[in-house]
């Protein structure tokens, strides 16, 4: 059995958020003919993985969902929760105020909505397009986010997120992990949560080793899983420093890079 961890945005789908037939066919072939189990490893919330999981028939082949950058791990078929790591509730006001001080916006999630104080934020609208989940405006983010959360998301222009990331690490770095998943998204998660550490836990549950794993990604929140995997693959559209740390660089997501990687690494 082979395990294949796939980032979604910038990797599995195009910038138009399309799963091409070439990539879909290659992944169905990998599962059907090469005993491969797919793990969708994304910063997206759980509901935003469903349509892709269904299109790829992941549940039928015993695959897994890893939303929130690995903050949760679920069996795709049964939805049984294998692991969950959550931000402590006392961190939410601190994160909120840091984000506000740096002129960015903060979001989080329910099962049905993206919570925000600002409905007119173009960066929040990008998350709506990516996840397919509607925004729900709340008068007070802090009062609305009263439960432990897998993550918050700071959104805004890169020039605001870079100093915000540094401030989070300086002031809350013993409890919060902060890393960019795009030029306008800063992920705020429990310390130690990343796709690599989550995959290491899943490998342990399954009795597998990193050499059984291929991981494909395009951004900084994919780096730990690319480095963990026996074969770490960077997309052709990934930043150069991500590509340098991968074992293999495939074509871009506009050129069916996932399918090309499988042709070179699995279908041989």
Locations of regions flagged by a protein language model:
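Short active-site oxyanion
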Residues: 35-39, 63, 151, 211-213, ...
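Short, structured coil segments at secondary-structure junctions
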Residues: 56, 61, 69, 172-174, ...
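Hydrophobic packing residues within well-ordered alpha-helices of enzyme cores
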Residues: 23, 49-53, 164, 168, ...
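Short, well-ordered alpha-helical microsegments
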Residues: 46-50, 161, 222
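Asp-based phosphoryl-transfer active-site loop
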Residues: 2-17
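Active-site phosphate-binding/coordination module
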Residues: 21-123
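Mg2+-dependent phosphoryl-transfer enzymes with acidic/Ser/Thr/Gly-rich catalytic loops
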Residues: 1-3, 20, 187-268
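Conserved acidic, metal-coordinating active-site core of Asp-based
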Residues: 98, 102-216, 237
